[in-house]
Amino acid sequence: MAGGPPDAGMAYFSSNEKTETLIALAWALEEGSRRFYTGLAGSMTDIEGKVLFTELINAEERHKASLLALYHRSGGSGTIEPLLPGGAAGDVMEGGIRVSEALEWTAGRDAADILDLSIALESNAYDLYIKMERTVRDDLAKRVFSMLAEEEKHHLDRMTSLIEKKA
């Protein structure tokens, strides 16, 4: 296995994507991140890290709820899953990497390494939501993606504070 963290590449989308497609993409990435943080919270021995990742699980749930509400306000009905490739949230999270790959990489790593990876993923999500905000035409969708970007920035601030505390 390679020594470095998995590639946190950008999840690309076309500037012509429909708003509902961007909502579905964001929802799937939030679900993947929720799964990642759930895995971390369950396996971490660092108490402060465990508390932070547990709080992030709740934040990702709120993000998904905001995106589902936006989907419904945009005319969608039911759940978002039918819009996703294969009809269900996959194993991909913010950063465009697989949850299973990221969790495998974190096994046996210390809190600082795990926070470094998490910061890279949250930075990617922050960037993605800014791009989505600029891409959509709908004012409500712009506000939701702007709010998500701000929340990702808040997550980054919290992670950065914790990693600095541990340095």
Residue ranges and their predicted role:
Residues 2-167:
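Non-heme di-metal
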